[in-house]
Amino acid sequence: MRLPLLSFVIFALFALVFASGVVELQSLNELENTIRASKKGALIEFYATWCGHCKSLAPVYEELGALFEDHNDVLIGKIDADTHSDVADKYHITGFPTLIWFPPDGSEPVQYSNARDVDSLTQFVSEKTGIKKRKIVLPSNVVELDSLNFDKVVMDDKKDVLVEFYADWCGYCKRLAPTYETLGKVFKNEPNVEIVKINADVFADIGRLHEVASFPTIKFFPKDDKDKPELYEGDRSLESLIEYINKKSGTQRSPDGTLLSTAGRIPTFDEFAAEFLDMSNAAKEVVLEKVKQLALEDSSRWTKYYKKVFEKILNDENWVHKEAKRLSKLLRQKSIALASADDFKTRLNILNSFLPGNH
């Protein structure tokens, strides 16, 4: 017996979207079809890519999705309602993030208005579906310390270390938790930066030693001056914390964990690179000699790469365009390893210093 076409499409879509914990939906039509396919209901996050609160919610929502991943009849989904304005219009989305529960019987959707932590969201979905779940502990990108290992980790003179001193009962700490977890994820590929935390209520000796008077307290321990940690007094948003660490550690991370477009760039070489493609071959030869001389004074990896690019362009002007296109394609692959992504992004940044409009 053949299934009606619509039923087949919905079935196929249903099987596809539940392949991962949180389903990223791409259109109003896909959203509605997927909701209809959810036999026990659907929780949808309407978000915007620029929204700081959405970024803070992301790790919590991913954990929620993982928790219900093995229940194919429940949908934990999300859609960019800023890009898909027809979605925002239909569901009257006026702020981000907005979480809405869609009952399986097609009755009136319910906007979620409770706390945005894993426990509260899990309880909400469990009440709506009848599926009882316990919170699962996902691998963390933030190192949890105690009295025994605090000095070994924090006082490592090869690493800049950001420490959150927290207490379990502290409401502000709970609100900071998803942001701090994301912060750990952003910097997990930085070999000289560590994002850590310690329960200074339980390990009160550490709290007293470091003059922790309230929770959460965040301190930065620089690798070159461990005896003078700096109290972080800025905004506790993800963007502000990233900006702070980038400034203190010389890192160049963006909120999604990728490198900024300035990573790897060297101003001295950029000055030559900006005009190199338009120069005559004779002028290029002169510049290349200057670059080689500078490279003798600085043998760092990216200095060598600049030199290589100058040499490649001298032999083939089209090489820089082809190589930039190749690296861009590699960076779009979702399965790319973090270390490879950093390497490709830095190379692409340097190549862009040669290309018109990217200086």
UniProtKB/Swiss-Prot annotation:
CDD domains from the UniProt entry: ERp29c (cd00238), PDI_a_ERp38 (cd02998)
Organism whose genome encodes this protein: Schizosaccharomyces pombe (strain 972 / ATCC 24843)
Disulphide linkage map: 51-54, 170-173
Gene3D superfamilies according to UniProt: Endoplasmic reticulum resident protein 29, C-terminal domain (1.20.1150.12), Glutaredoxin (3.40.30.10)
Matches recorded under PROSITE patterns: THIOREDOXIN_1 (PS00194), THIOREDOXIN_2 (PS51352)
GO biological process: cellular response to oxidative stress; protein folding; protein folding in endoplasmic reticulum
Family assignment from sequence similarity: Belongs to the protein disulfide isomerase family.
Keyword list, A-Z: Disulfide bond, Isomerase, Redox-active center, Repeat, Signal
InterPro entries: ERp29_C, ERp29_C_sf, PDI, PDI_thioredoxin-like_dom, Thioredoxin-like_sf, Thioredoxin_CS, Thioredoxin_domain
Signal sequence segment: 1-19
Site location (Contributes to redox potential value): 52-53
Ranges where the Thioredoxin domain occurs: 20-130, 134-250
EC number: 5.3.4.1
Record-marked site positions (Lowers pKa of C-terminal Cys of first active site): 116
Function: Participates in the folding of proteins containing disulfide bonds, may be involved in glycosylation, prolyl hydroxylation and triglyceride transfer.
The name this protein goes by in its record: Protein disulfide-isomerase C17H9.14c
PANTHER family, sorted: PROTEIN DISULFIDE-ISOMERASE C17H9.14C, PROTEIN DISULFIDE-ISOMERASE C17H9.14C-RELATED
Domain of life, source organism: Eukaryota
